[in-house]
Amino acid sequence: MEIIYGNILAESIKSSMKQKIDDIRAQKKRLPLLSVVLVGNNPASMSYVRGKEKACSSIGMLQKTIRLDENVSQEELSNVIMELNLDPEVDGILVQMPLPEHLDETAALELIDPQKDVDGLHPMNAGCLLTNRPGFIPCTPQGVMAMLDSIGYKDLSGKRAVVCGRSNLVGKPVALLLQNRNATVTIVHSKTPNIEQIASQADVLIVAMGVSQMVNENWVKEGAVVIDVGINRVNGKLVGDCDFESVAKKASYVSPVPKGVGPMTVCMLLSNTLDAYKMHTQGE
């Protein structure tokens, strides 16, 4: 059994991006800029934003966080997003979720210019993914696919993939990406009967249920690849949706939590922002 360390893979990809940004700087061109909109003082959100700020800094990418009061109105939030849409210096826009309850998250996401939607959550980018056209792919699913790339799982013809979870953020986009690579894909979720039996037929098992250590060796086919997308806090420790020690008995590859998908998500956000920059500066 081998462990797919997302943190090591992310550092390798970030090193390549840093070189590209160093080249841009050497040519005295403007640098890529990611703008993050943070509403309120949610400790988890603030921690995630700090992680993004640190990651941008590590590769020389510019980053600006717009902090708004938790009582901000929908109109004020909309105005901030529209200003960022019109700012030619801004390449990527990310609205940190969750927003306070009085704000409409969907309306905020739909306001972002699809060409600056580096989180890949705008309906237009979702449509591009559905129809296999170029567009921004959500960062966590993109990170999962990069992890599969790293072990040579680029063409999944003849492979059966099972995705545990059907969220718009992870489950659905991962299923589409696997399908685009010729895998035969099944999505299971909390209402699926015999979920363990279905999962145990998978050559590639992607787990994104949001239930700590739910998946054990009984869910895993001998020699399967298991990617654990779950992030749960239990007794002050971060754990995934898989019981790592149990799953490792049968899997050929497994991703850990922490040091797995999490670092890859942030890495893909930077990658999308760099791609947006290239699109915005074409012909300059």
Put a short name on every predicted segment:
Residues 39-53, 135-225, 237-245:
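Glycine-rich phosphate/diphosphate-binding loop of Rossmann-like nucleotide-binding domains
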Residues 56-70, 185-187:
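Short beta-strand elements in bilobed, periplasmic/extracellular small-molecule ligand-binding domains
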Residues 76-88:
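Short, well-structured alpha-helical segments in soluble
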Residues 98, 208-211, 230-231:
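Short glycine-/small-residue-rich Rossmann-like dinucleotide-binding loops
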